[in-house]
Amino acid sequence: MALTDYTENLILDTLFGVNDVTALGSSALDKNTLYVALFTSETSDTGGGNEVSTSGTAYARIAVANNNSDNKWDDAVLGVKKNAAAITFANAMASWGTVTHVAIFDASSGGNMIAHGGLTQSKAVASGDTFKFDIGDLQITLN
């Protein structure tokens, strides 16, 4: 997964003094929870893509704790951060289509896309299926 333009700018502006770290209250750098979202089309550094429909499908973004105490994310190593716990979506109540991309947001709906990327293998999600990322499947890279 790659960081979006929003996140790259936020990090650079914070590192180089444009943003005061204590004033980041509403930014992704100060969120206790991040949200994993699934897409049926390509995402980009500026956002976009078709997120799986929430209408009658039982789809919702999955909340993932964003702190050191819950161990949901591994420590970054060589510019790579991975999920340290499985991320499991609810059983689909109707077809979600073919999931091709994933993104991380700072809100349960809307919000800012933090990181995004294509799946190594797309997956058609039919009614009754459960979509899951195993430990280490999500890798966010800063390079």
PLM region descriptions:
Residues 1-102, 106-143:
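Small cysteine-rich, disulfide-bonded extracellular modules of the LU/uPAR three-finger superfamily
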